[in-house]
């Protein structure tokens, strides 16, 4: 079995794979102040609930966009699983040709998603990840990662609206069926929701126009379902795209990481 860990700015997603099949998955809040023991106890609690033990795990791979938490994560893997994890970063075999100014700047989550989407759905492909930031990545018909766009995520924008507009309340992010709100809260929710649907459709359309291609569009991330249910611009919703990419990258790099 393989343990895959995706460390995002808001949440960490943990999954267990066996023979390329996702058996279990969990989510925990990303807290950069957590110790390795706190992380270990959380993961072991997940395992206990699923009748798994640390000895079931033969390898671990981690993707992280939160550098301060990585020392604790790596220590946790060694202390509780006796495994030195594979870290997605420079030197890892991805199978992608990165045609960008500085490949080291690309977030590991974007690389992982691009690997998974290219393998699972073919190229050309656009990957939209609705996370803390909303990211758009374009991989052309030759499998070349051409770059993309990064926009503030839904939660960031919602909090900014509350923090910078004195008379506007904090609101929950919710799907809205009416663009014309009848109250301040309803108007904010409509603006936030339809604003991000429009952002998604507009950026996808512009990528298609500038690339002169007809890529398949794959969406992932915690808020992807809510947005994509209102948008015809997305072809495929894959909530486990990042975990799939991690498992695939582990197999591509397995000879140097398995215990």
UniProtKB/Swiss-Prot annotation:
Keyword Metal-binding belongs to the record: yes
Keyword terms: ATP-binding, Coenzyme A biosynthesis, Cytoplasm, Kinase, Metal-binding, Nucleotide-binding, Potassium, Transferase
Domain of life (superkingdom): Bacteria
Cofactor(s) it depends on: NH4(+); K(+)
Residues reported to bind ATP: 6-13, 132
Pathway in which this enzyme or protein is active: Cofactor biosynthesis; coenzyme A biosynthesis; CoA from (R)-pantothenate: step 1/5
GO MF assignments: ATP binding; metal ion binding; pantothenate kinase activity
Compartment(s) of residence: Cytoplasm
Keyword ATP-binding recorded: yes
Catalytic-site annotation from UniProt: 109 (proton acceptor)
A GO CC term attached to the entry: cytoplasm
Catalytic activity: (R)-pantothenate + ATP = (R)-4'-phosphopantothenate + ADP + H(+)
EC number: 2.7.1.33
Cofactor note: A monovalent cation. Ammonium or potassium.
Chain sites annotated for binding substrate: 107-110, 184
Classification via Pfam families: Pan_kinase
Family, per entry: Belongs to the type III pantothenate kinase family.
Subunit structure: Homodimer.
Function: Catalyzes the phosphorylation of pantothenate (Pan), the first step in CoA biosynthesis.
Protein name, per record: Type III pantothenate kinase
Organism taxonomic ancestry: Bacteria, Bacillati, Bacillota, Bacilli, Bacillales
